[in-house]
């Protein structure tokens, strides 16, 4: 029993995070030097994301009997994403108005360091809806894979899958090659995942060493408020959706606990994307559904980021005594419904979208972003964790709606009673 515990990735990552926190707190300079360990692990994961998505989507689509099913899956997924992300935005807006974490700070925007957020504000101006949609189309196929742009790779994979499906038996050889290549890729993922504890240790040691636990105190109320809101969203909103769909959110969280710990350590939901593709398929969701929903969700279903955006924007208004009436807040909500969809594949995307939104609304001081900049790194964990759980739940929900969910397998896996190698019929 003890041996299996020490060998489990869950235990190893959890221990690594704890050691990283201690090192960063007691030896901050040394902790800050651990940054390359976390960066290297995240880069290894990002290296493999493009081929994983390509193989999963192509084999999933090419292996389907009807192409109408693919279109139906995409439409249902986008509808679900819009509804749930809107709920997340509204919840963030309600909670920040009730708790008012920025009230009483009385910050003068003129005293803030506007230069600290100048880079983000400049990037925000480049992030528009038209630019976002145009960016989905790659300049070249090689460029899409080289840059690791998820949506560009996804678009090419969907087109490739459609074309391969139309070839019928003539494309069987190509299908077999891609499927075999997929097995090799997942073998590489298993090797990379053995380094997850080292990556989590390095990232956490750097965060605590560079920013320090003490830096959380001044703006701690916003951080606590945000974390509690994310927890409530997962338990209440996603929990209700899961219950209606026919599974327990708590059992689902237990099922993806290793992925959640990796995300917690690295603050990057992308670090768990390859394993989520594999795990959701093992949970009973058809490969074609998983291949479409998970990668698309990383751009259109960022529940944690949605909560963060409304809370951060209103917090800045409260802290700088910038009055926001109901009209201003509705305007903020509408702008965020559009701007939050343009965060795909951008480093520091949440903060950049926040800068774009504040600039678009025009009622809030852009310099107020400096208040959030210092604590944004500590809020990224909750964003990433909520995004991951949200995309996992979305995959199961969409799979059920389009009748591509193996209900028996779902129940067996979540209740730890799935026999190895046993398959079930897809429920209708």
Swiss-Prot record:
Pfam families: SDF. The keyword Cytoplasm does not apply. Its main location: membrane. GO terms for cellular component: plasma membrane. GO terms for molecular function: fumarate transmembrane transporter activity; malate:proton symporter activity; succinate transmembrane transporter activity. GO terms for biological process: L-aspartate transmembrane transport. Disulfide bonds: none annotated. Keywords: Cell inner membrane, Cell membrane, Membrane, Symport, Transmembrane, Transmembrane helix, Transport. It is a multi-pass membrane protein. InterPro entries: C4_dicarb_transport, Na-dicarboxylate_symporter, Na-dicarboxylate_symporter_CS, Na:dicarbo_symporter_sf. The chain crosses the membrane at residues 4-24, 44-64, 76-96, 142-162, 184-204, 222-242, 289-309, 326-346, 352-372. It is found in: Cell inner membrane. Belongs to the dicarboxylate/amino acid:cation symporter (DAACS) (TC 2.A.23) family. Responsible for the transport of dicarboxylates such as succinate, fumarate, and malate from the periplasm across the membrane. This is C4-dicarboxylate transport protein. It comes from Salmonella arizonae (strain ATCC BAA-731 / CDC346-86 / RSK2980). The lineage of its organism: Bacteria, Pseudomonadati, Pseudomonadota, Gammaproteobacteria, Enterobacterales.
């Amino acid at each position: 029993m003890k041996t299996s515990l020490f060998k489990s990735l869950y235990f190893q990552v959890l221990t690594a995070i704890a050691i990283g926190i201690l090192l960063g707190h007691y030896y901050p300079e040394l902790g800050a030097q651990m940054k390359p360990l976390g960066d290297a692990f995240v880069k290894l994961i990002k290296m493999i994301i493009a081929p994983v998505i390509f193989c999963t989507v192509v084999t999933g689509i090419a292996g389907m009997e009807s192409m109408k099913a693919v279109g139906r899956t995409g439409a249902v997924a986008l509808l679900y994403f819009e509804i749930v992300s809107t709920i997340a935005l509204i919840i963030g807006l309600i909670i920040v108005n009730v708790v008012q974490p920025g009230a009483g700070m009385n910050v003068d925007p003129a005293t803030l360091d506007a230069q600290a957020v100048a880079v983000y504000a400049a990037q925000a101006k480049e992030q528009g809806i038209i630019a976002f949609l145009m960016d989905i189309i790659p300049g070249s196929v090689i460029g899409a894979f080289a840059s690791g742009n998820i949506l560009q790779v996804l678009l090419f994979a969907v087109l490739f899958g459609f074309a391969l499906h139309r070839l019928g038996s003539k494309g069987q050889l190509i299908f077999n090659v891609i499927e075999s290549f997929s097995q090799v890729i997942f073998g590489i993922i298993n090797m990379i995942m053995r380094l997850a504890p080292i990556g989590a240790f390095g990232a956490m040691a750097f965060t605590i060493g560079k920013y320090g636990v003490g830096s959380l105190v001044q703006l701690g109320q916003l951080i606590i408020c945000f974390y509690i809101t994310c927890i409530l969203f997962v338990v209440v909103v996603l929990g209700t959706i899961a219950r209606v769909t026919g599974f327990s959110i708590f059992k689902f969280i237990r099922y993806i606990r290793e992925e959640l710990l990796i995300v917690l350590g690295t603050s990057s939901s992308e670090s768990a994307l390859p394993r989520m593709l594999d795990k959701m398929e093992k949970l009973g969701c058809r490969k074609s559904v998983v291949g479409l929903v998970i990668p698309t969700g990383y751009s259109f279903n960022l529940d944690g980021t949605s909560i963060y955006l409304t809370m951060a924007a209103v917090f800045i208004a409260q802290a700088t005594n910038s009055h926001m009436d109901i009209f201003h807040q509705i305007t903020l909500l509408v702008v965020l419904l559009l701007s939050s969809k343009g965060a795909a594949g951008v480093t520091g995307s949440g903060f950049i979208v926040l800068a774009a939104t504040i600039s678009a609304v025009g009622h809030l001081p852009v310099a107020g972003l400096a208040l959030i900049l210092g604590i944004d790194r500590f809020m990224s964990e909750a964003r990433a964790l909520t995004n991951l759980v949200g995309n996992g739940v979305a995959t199961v929900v969409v799979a059920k709606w389009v009748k591509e969910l193996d209900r028996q397998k779902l129940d067996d896996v979540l209740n730890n009673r799935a026999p190895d190698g046993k398959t079930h019929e897809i429920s209708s």
